[in-house]
């Protein structure tokens, strides 16, 4: 049900992904505004207007960078171009229910094949693959029992071993989407607008960071 004997060795951050987010925002934390949702973005050749919920006047900027999901960016744009519609619509997100639990029956029967990501196939081609992350491996947890996160599970998990359920949205990769990824230059950098997010790569945190670095390069900045 999962990886073979040649399990990849991964490097992980102590404290999980939260630790690198804290490091990245160290220099500008006071410029991050929470509980101030953006509801609309209007663009002109000379400026960008950002409208926030319950605020009558827009905030003016020279440029806008969308560090959001592709569908969220498209929804916020007041006047998306045909290229923006075509590319962003081809890179959709889908909702997944993530279940945090301790039921190791979702893991491979042979323990030495346990890996960070483990797939379970039902044989039903109309049913999505069940994916289980082993958090003990991913976050170097020295803990008992094994803490797992499973996506797209249909009743395989023992109810007594469920800790929490969370709704997430993840990139949905298709052949059309792979072609759309190659057209990023047609929309990012146009109309004073730039796009970054994990959907430009394979959906990993690293892909999100790499796409952000691409935007930095567009501004002549290297990190």
Predicted feature descriptions by range:
Residues 4, 28-29, 61-62, 190-191:
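Short, well-ordered alpha-helix to beta-strand connector turns
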Residues 27-38:
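A conserved beta-strand/loop element that lines the FAD pocket in flavoprotein oxidoreductases
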Residues 32-34, 66, 195:
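A structural signal for the hydrophobic beta-strands that form the central parallel beta-sheet
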Residues 36-171:
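Mid-domain catalytic core of redox enzymes
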Residues 20:
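Short active-site alpha-helical segment characteristic of glycosyltransferases
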Residues 1-8:
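Short, small-residue-biased leader/transition segments that mark boundaries at the very start
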Residues 127-223:
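Conserved flavin/dinucleotide-binding core of flavoenzymes
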